[in-house]
Amino acid sequence: MAKKITGYIKLQIPAAKANPSPPIGPALGQHGVNIMEFCKAFNAKTQADEGTIIPVVITVYADRSFTFITKVPPMSVLIKKAVGIESGSSVPNKNKVGKLTREQVREIATKKLPDMNAASLEAAMRTVEGTARSMGVEIVN
């Protein structure tokens, strides 16, 4: 028989930088999860992507054990990395902070597709373009 699931915890943590301080400690502590065990496992698994924010879904079981799944970084993080900027524009329609090519849009959409609810790569590309526009990034051919 499968273990009984008592809850799911969704967090966004910088890769290889999980530590027991807030927000991780309190979120895991209230479910009775061994915080240090999670931090060590997460840091080991995300060592290659150091510095990038990684969404993680932690499944907590009745015996206080856990499993976790890491997901693809948020689309805005991927766009900022591709363009090479720290943050998006404060006035997206007036100030453009960078340019993104169609090829870069396709690359981001391909990477993010498993976590999206888009039916096709083209739909995912339109979603990436919309997010980029709302950040003040221009799409160029």
Curated annotation (Swiss-Prot):
Record-linked SUPFAM superfamilies: Ribosomal L11/L12e N-terminal domain, Ribosomal protein L11, C-terminal domain
Gene Ontology cellular component annotations, sorted alphabetically: cytosolic large ribosomal subunit
Swiss-Prot/TrEMBL GO biological process terms: translation
InterPro entries in alphabetical order: Ribosomal_uL11, Ribosomal_uL11_bac-typ, Ribosomal_uL11_C, Ribosomal_uL11_C_sf, Ribosomal_uL11_N, Ribosomal_uL11_N_sf
Gene3D superfamilies: Ribosomal protein L11, C-terminal domain, Ribosomal protein L11/L12, N-terminal domain
GO molecular function terms attached to this record: large ribosomal subunit rRNA binding; structural constituent of ribosome
Keyword terms, alphabetized: Methylation, Ribonucleoprotein, Ribosomal protein, RNA-binding, rRNA-binding
Superkingdom of the organism of origin: Bacteria
PTM comment text: One or more lysine residues are methylated.
A Pfam family the protein falls into: Ribosomal_L11_N
Subunit and partners: Part of the ribosomal stalk of the 50S ribosomal subunit. Interacts with L10 and the large rRNA to form the base of the stalk. L10 forms an elongated spine to which L12 dimers bind in a sequential fashion forming a multimeric L10(L12)X complex.
Sequence similarity: Belongs to the universal ribosomal protein uL11 family.
Described purpose of this protein according to its UniProt entry: Forms part of the ribosomal stalk which helps the ribosome interact with GTP-bound translation factors.
Protein name: Large ribosomal subunit protein uL11
Classification of source organism: Bacteria, Pseudomonadati, Thermodesulfobacteriota, Desulfuromonadia, Geobacterales
